């Protein structure tokens, strides 16, 4: 059976964890969603093409070997957000819409984000029966 095997290395990475409230953690390794996105980008698939990404997710199996989980880097952010009353008054589909309120209706919030420094992974991609693309 053929596999696509490659290394991922980065001086700084974040592998999204569940983000609730002001804390955005990071896993120690890339998850399936990140690997499907990376594979999709390499194939030229647009981020908005949900059907193509679902086909990648169903069509391949992924394995991650952690060569170096790196060190934790915790960063603190500030962001401006409108109050709830301001949002009730207007539609807000984008971040730009959220900030298009009078300045005195904006509030500052603090958030914490985790990153991993100097990470290294060995990734193996295995095509399954319904893989949409052949491996090189």
Q: Each PLM stretch: what is its role?
A:
Residues 8-14:
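Short polar catalytic/cofactor-binding loops
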Residues 66-136:
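Internal, well-folded beta-alpha domain core
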Residues 1, 61, 118-122:
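Short, surface-exposed beta-edge/turn micro-motifs
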Residues 13, 19-23, 48, 99, ...:
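Generic preference for well-ordered secondary structure
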Residues 1-7:
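Charged, low-complexity intrinsically disordered regulatory segments in eukaryotic signaling
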Residues 2, 17-91:
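Glycine/small-residue-rich interface belts in oligomeric ring/scaffold proteins
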């Amino acid at each position: 059976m053929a596999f696509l095997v490659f290394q991922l290395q980065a001086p700084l990475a974040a592998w999204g964890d569940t983000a609730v409230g002001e804390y955005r953690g990071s896993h120690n390794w890339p998850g399936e969603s990140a690997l499907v996105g990376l594979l999709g980008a390499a194939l030229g698939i647009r981020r908005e093409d949900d059907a193509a990404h679902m086909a990648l997710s169903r069509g391949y199996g992924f394995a991650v070997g952690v060569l170096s989980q790196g060190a934790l880097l915790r960063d603190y952010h500030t962001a401006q957000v409108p109050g709830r009353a301001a949002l009730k008054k207007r539609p807000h589909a984008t971040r730009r819409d959220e900030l298009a309120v009078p300045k005195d209706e904006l509030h500052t919030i603090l958030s914490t984000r985790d990153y991993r420094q100097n990470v290294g992974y060995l990734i193996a991609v295995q095509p399954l029966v319904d893989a949409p693309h052949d491996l090189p």
